[in-house]
């Protein structure tokens, strides 16, 4: 017995029995991705919603194709196509109320357009301008995020602040499977779960972080399983089934709005095109893999359901295609009319009074551009 024990100042007590803070069982995702199209659940889907999803999918596919063509014409610096992932893009945009916020990643231009942003404005950043091109507050769409996962803490912060103010607002944050390897992903999910922020995280698992397959990114059974460690439910859904993605996201949005806290949704999908126009996808995947996923195309899946239920005929499908073509023609014409960008604008809106370092950088860029122009002029 120690001196302190003899004096009665120390009374050791057995530790309390350990109890989990949260029962993990209800948080676990299903073993298989949830599906609606081609199942009995399809009969319960709202016909008008299915038609709207179809029209937006067709428009989105054409938008991806036109934007990719604009890169080849030099009108866009880069375009990360979402061809094959349109179901996730459209469902994420349509599931939100007008008062809610969407936080997109760099590949989510289609979701931005489906949310109501002008198609030309949505491409402003990707054509090399210094700003995102649209007013985030007008459309409740955060600026496109080029750095991986940085939009996730922003979404959580906005959602948490809205709840503190008593605003009925839900934030939906989009990210790819590669973004789940970033520190911002952990910080966002941890904060959201601890403070029960009204936010939904949509992970579009398209199989690759540029060229890195999912098996080299995580050893978890699925990305949705990561939710359990944070104390939030994880949902697994077929990301090419637009009706299923919309239903799962709608459930998560309702839960968040009712004070139930965040949800992590993993949508299993596939990036049919290359990572960007600067990527050679044949170096890390084969044609057979791509063609196999084309058989599970989101537009074909929904079209088959609609025609089978008598909700879509050839005239309706042609109307959707014509509307998409009209949008593409307008996008093409307006992008070709855009004035050339002034690189010096990059330095204009950083500080009210430019710092010496900023002025130095501006002059350095000006000199480099002048030297480049002189070199071009000297060529025979």
Give residue ranges: language-model regions.
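A general secondary-structure junction signal
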Residues: 106, 267-269, 350
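Glycine-rich ThDP/TPP pyrophosphate-binding loop and its adjacent helix/strand module
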Residues: 147-337
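Residues in well-ordered alpha-helical elements
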Residues: 120, 243-246, 344
């Amino acid at each position: 017995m120690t001196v302190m024990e003899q004096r009665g100042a120390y009374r050791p007590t057995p530790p309390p029995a350990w109890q989990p803070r949260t029962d993990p069982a209800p948080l676990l995702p299903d073993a298989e991705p949830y599906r609606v199209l081609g199942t009995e659940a399809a009969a319960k889907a709202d016909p008008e919603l299915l038609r709207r999803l179809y029209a937006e999918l067709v428009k989105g596919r054409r938008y991806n194709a036109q934007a990719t063509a604009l890169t080849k014409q030099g009108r866009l610096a880069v375009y990360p196509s979402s061809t094959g992932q349109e179901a996730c893009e459209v469902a994420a945009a349509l599931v939100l109320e007008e008062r809610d916020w969407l936080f997109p990643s760099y590949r989510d231009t289609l979701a931005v357009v489906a949310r109501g942003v002008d198609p030309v404005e949505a491409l402003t950043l990707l054509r090399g301008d210094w700003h995102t091109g649209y007013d985030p507050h007008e459309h409740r769409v955060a600026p496109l995020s080029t750095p991986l996962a940085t939009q996730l803490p922003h979404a959580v912060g906005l959602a948490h602040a809205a709840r503190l103010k008593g605003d009925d607002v839900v934030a939906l944050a989009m990210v790819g499977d590669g973004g789940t390897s970033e520190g911002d992903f952990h910080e966002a999910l941890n904060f959201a779960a601890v403070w029960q922020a009204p936010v939904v995280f949509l992970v579009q698992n398209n199989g690759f972080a540029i060229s890195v397959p999912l098996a080299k990114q995580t050893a978890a059974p699925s990305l949705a399983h990561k939710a359990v460690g944070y104390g939030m439910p994880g949902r697994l859904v077929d990301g090419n089934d637009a009706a299923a993605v919309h239903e799962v996201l709608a459930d998560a949005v309702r839960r968040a709005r009712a004070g139930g806290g965040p949800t992590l949704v993993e949508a299993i999908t596939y990036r049919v095109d290359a990572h960007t126009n600067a990527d050679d996808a044949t170096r890390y995947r084969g044609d057979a893999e791509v063609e196999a996923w084309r058989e599970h195309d989101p537009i074909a899946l929904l079209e088959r359901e609609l025609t089978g239920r008598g909700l879509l005929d050839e005239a309706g499908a042609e109307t959707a295609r014509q509307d998409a073509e009209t949008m593409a023609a307008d996008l093409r014409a307006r992008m070709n009319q855009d004035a050339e960008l002034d690189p010096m604008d990059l330095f204009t809106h950083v500080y009210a009074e430019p710092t010496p370092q900023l002025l130095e950088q501006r002059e350095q860029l000006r000199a480099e551009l002048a030297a480049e122009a002189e070199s071009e002029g000297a060529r025979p």
